From Swiss-Prot:
Listed GO CC annotations: extracellular region; extracellular space
Tissue specificity of this protein: Expressed in keratinocytes, monocytes and in resting dendritic cells.
Organism domain of life: Eukaryota
Function: May play a role in the regulation of immune cell function. Cytokine that imparts cellular protection against viral infection in a species-specific manner. Activates the interferon-stimulated response element signaling pathway. It is able to directly modulate cytokine release from monocytes and dendritic cells. Binds heparin.
Name the record gives this protein: Interferon kappa
Gene encoding the protein: IFNK
GO biological process, one term: cellular response to virus
Species per Swiss-Prot/TrEMBL record: Homo sapiens
């Protein structure tokens, strides 16, 4: 009688391991970074939408504004390294959120895929940021000297503001004692956040 659950569990882990293998293969080449970011972000958006059937009406009264930094909402021409840093910070913070006392009614398959995608993405981005650092260290001073005054004032995507944003989400979950409504609100909010990051991948591709 236990054959069916066992088979389901085996299939689930096989799919998860396949996801790890694919991500690991892509991580060998930072030239494929945009392909990876676009694919994983889109998959996570789909998983977040599939984790719950619909947003409970009774949770509307608990909904709050987490204030995703305006620079992320309005930024249209970020530098590649800014995007990488922002994606790296988002991946770490979102992974930490989804590794806590998650909503018991969420579909485990989707949650596991999100966790794996974010974890592999963070490792991949860290590798590429290190490569950028090594490649550009000698050119940094030259570029700063050649930079025009108007370019020097271009705002950067702030990792600090992004950390504060996720800190507000984390505090909300703690204050609500990780209630079902709190997790549903957070699910929708992080899906919104990922939507803006998905738009960044298009900018990255045009660079």
């Amino acid at each position: 009688m236990s054959t069916k659950p066992d088979m389901i569990q085996k299939c689930l882990w096989l799919e998860i391991l396949m996801g790890i293998f694919i991500a690991g293969t892509l991580s060998l080449d930072c030239n494929l970074l945009n392909v990876h970011l676009r694919r994983v972000t889109w998959q996570n958006l789909r998983h977040l939408s599939s984790m719950s059937n619909s947003f409970p009406v009774e949770c509307l009264r608990e909904n709050i504004a987490f204030e995703l930094p305006q620079e992320f909402l309005q930024y249209t021409q970020p530098m590649k390294r800014d995007i990488k840093k922002a994606f790296y910070e988002m991946s770490l913070q979102a992974f930490n959120i989804f590794s806590q006392h998650t909503f018991k009614y969420w579909k485990e398959r989707h949650l596991k895929q999100i966790q794996i995608g974010l974890d592999q993405q963070a490792e991949y981005l860290n590798q590429c940021l290190e490569e950028d650092k090594n490649e550009n260290e000698d050119m940094k001073e030259m570029k700063e000297n050649e930079m025009k005054p108007s370019e020097a004032r271009v705002p950067q995507l702030s990792s600090l503001e992004l950390r504060r944003y996720f800190h507000r989400i984390d505090n909300f979950l703690k204050e609500k004692k990780y209630s079902d409504c709190a997790w549903e609100i957070v699910r929708v909010e992080i899906r919104r956040c990922l939507y803006y990051f998905y738009k960044f991948t298009a900018l990255f591709r045009r660079k």
